[in-house]
Amino acid sequence: MADSDKDELAEIAGFGYERARDELVNVVKMLEQGGMDLDESLALWERGEALANRCEEHLAGARKRVEDALAGSESDES
């Protein structure tokens, strides 16, 4: 993996959910428009995959927080 790829992944790892989602939407739009050569398209697709993974991480964390809160509520009621 090239240093620029590592830098990009490190940058994406710091994104909040909304920023990652918004950038992912833009990546999808650009890919749908076409007009890029194969290398550009692949690089953009790889960025989209990293952004999608970041969104999934945020959603998994949110899901866990909700489950934990619900479990705490249920134990308080017992």
From Swiss-Prot:
What organism is the protein native to? Nocardia farcinica (strain IFM 10152)
The biological process GO terms on file are: DNA catabolic process
Q: What class of enzyme is it?
A: hydrolase
State its Enzyme Commission number(s). Answer: 3.1.11.6
Q: Does the keyword Calcium apply?
A: no
SUPFAM superfamilies xrefs: XseB-like
Its annotated compartments are:
Cytoplasm
What is this protein's record name? Exodeoxyribonuclease 7 small subunit
Q: Name one GO molecular function term.
A: exodeoxyribonuclease VII activity
Q: Which Pfam families match?
A: Exonuc_VII_S
Which Gene3D superfamilies does the record match to this protein? Exonuclease VII, small subunit
Q: Key word Cytoplasm present in the record?
A: yes
GO annotation, cellular component aspect: cytosol; exodeoxyribonuclease VII complex
Q: Where is it chiefly localized? A: cytoplasm
Q: Which UniProt keywords apply?
A: Cytoplasm, Exonuclease, Hydrolase, Nuclease
Family stated for the protein in its record: Belongs to the XseB family.
Biological function:
Bidirectionally degrades single-stranded DNA into large acid-insoluble oligonucleotides, which are then degraded further into small acid-soluble oligonucleotides.
Show the coiled coil region(s): none
Q: How does it assemble?
A: Heterooligomer composed of large and small subunits.
Its UniProt entry gives the catalysed reaction(s) as: Exonucleolytic cleavage in either 5'- to 3'- or 3'- to 5'-direction to yield nucleoside 5'-phosphates
